[in-house]
Amino acid sequence: MAESEKEAALPPKEEFSEWYNELLWMAEIMDVRYPVKGLYVWYPFGFAIRRNTYNIIREILDNSGHQEALFPLLIPENEFMKEAEHIKGFEDEVYWVTHGGRDTLDIPLALRPTSETAIYPMYKMWVRSHADFPIKIYQIVNTFRYETKHTRPLIRLREITSFKEAHTVHATWEDAEAQVKEAIGLYTEIYRRLGVPVLRSRRPDWDKFPGADYTDALDAIMPDGRTLQIGTAHHLGDNFAKTFDIKYETPDGEQRYAYQTCYGISERSIAATISIHGDDKGLVLPPEIAPVQVVIIPIIFKKGAEEVLAACKDVKERLTKAGIRVEIDASDLRPGAKYYKWEMKGVPLRLEIGPRDLQNNVAVAVRRDTGEKEQISLPEIEAGVSSKFEAIHENLYQKAKVELENRIFECTELEEVKNKIQDGVATIPWCGKRECGRAMEDVIGAGILGIPLEQKRDRKEKCPICGEETETRVYVARTY
């Protein structure tokens, strides 16, 4: 980018759509100019955010008994079409490969929209005995969906570049149920590491994953009040096992169908993180995923310039040895331009070191999240920086948590819901009947997210459609 472009004004965050689109470009996360709708290019800086985010995901999954594997992108049509209910949910979104060179293929090949039909034929061959369970395998791959709605980088794409999908196999329905609960817990932990509070709910039957017994999901509330689905976990029952003939032998020698789950998370995790934490100056990144965690700005005058630069290099070397990602900006840009650049990129901590700081044996630390300035003793720079990182992360999470809680509105009337969902998420009593839920959605003009997983059922209220008493409330929201 030209220097004039780098210092162009970012729209205020209250104009969220414009802010988001400009931020992706100005902070060098994604370039949207690729000549195919819904396909985008990761800049190196954005890809580093992705890599650091997915390092967290891999760590948490690996530490909970999951194993990473890799399955093919292409799925034969005859395998893809086996699960009728599942396919109904995806058939309008599938990309098909029909030719190899100039030859028409005997069997068309689907570009995976999701991988159940690629993985489960292999599970049929792998699963033999109850001793094999649980099988907990995941992969991180690109998937393709022919989106006809308005596409948006990281949020609604035709190529999902970073789809983490886990597929597990179990002996009983109850074991699979426990796995869904574990998955939701793992996802909550991932988002805690990203400083993102979540809503957790069970989707209504008409919005569950095609072919599943039920779906639990995580949503974030975005700055414009809409919710973004950022994780799902599906109990598949034995539905896919029957379709793909996945059986195991019990201790008594009996052959039974297995029970399965699958759960996914994508680059929407990054969309939520940058949207919730960012501000009018640009990105505000949690230290753990920031490509540059500390930027050192030498404050140089003619006298003492060499000593200042030497001190900056020493600090960088020490912090790097401590596992911290550091850059020194010794460019010819004026200090204000340097601050602008690194604030836009969301660097969590800026260290300023000048001649007077050297005399006092300190660096001036400036936090990106609050703008607070504080001196850190140079002999204790490693511990001082690490302490700042912990404080920054906790502040980002607590601030976002308060914002989320302030955007959840308890309602009893549908007209009230219509008003409140302009700013966030409403809750409303629901009897649980499909016809009442659908009627509510029609009146409100928005969807039921689901029943909160941690809901307290301590009072009876009336369903606004049929008047039946219920202890259940549901989340209602505008969604992406």
Curated annotation (Swiss-Prot):
Superkingdom: Archaea
A Gene Ontology BP annotation from the UniProt entry: prolyl-tRNA aminoacylation
Domain notes: Consists of three domains: the N-terminal catalytic domain, the anticodon-binding domain and the C-terminal extension.
Gene source species: Methanosarcina barkeri (strain Fusaro / DSM 804)
Homology family: Belongs to the class-II aminoacyl-tRNA synthetase family. ProS type 3 subfamily.
SUPFAM superfamilies reported for this sequence: C-terminal domain of ProRS, Class II aaRS ABD-related, Class II aaRS and biotin synthetases
Name listed for the protein in its UniProt record: Proline--tRNA ligase
Primary role: Catalyzes the attachment of proline to tRNA(Pro) in a two-step reaction: proline is first activated by ATP to form Pro-AMP and then transferred to the acceptor end of tRNA(Pro).
GO MF annotations in UniProt: ATP binding; proline-tRNA ligase activity
